[in-house]
Amino acid sequence: IGKSVFGARKNLMDIDKVFQDQLIKITQEAAVSVYPHLGKNNKVIADEAATNSMRTNLNKMNIKGNIVIGEGEMDEAPMLYIGEKVGTKKGPEFDIAVDPLEGTNFAAKNLPGAISVIAISNKNNLFNAPES
């Protein structure tokens, strides 16, 4: 993890390569963590594996992250819930939208189409979308 995700820049669009690579690695590792569960007809276990991986890796980043779109409300999801704070609490503040495993049924049935997703923006720039 670099000293700064921006170097001398303050705009998210100017994020450095190290920061970009960290985000790519987070989604890759979340996707790979699902591999042992492919085709086992248990979408809950597959989703838990991806969520655990993504949360663990987000918490290693030098950011103050706020999940604005996640796995559900705090009382419905144990991790990556809306409002959860992630990162080391050092560095710039971000809003984060995640879906560690989009297409849980595809993964459970070993079908193509499941993906791991993360979107990140400067604080207060992502629409906070609690599920209704």
Per-segment meaning from a language model:
Residues G91-E102, F106-A129:
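DPxDG-like acidic metal-binding loop motif
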Residues S4-A97:
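N-terminal subdomain of lithium-sensitive/metallo-dependent phosphomonoesterases centered on the IMPase/IPPase/PAP
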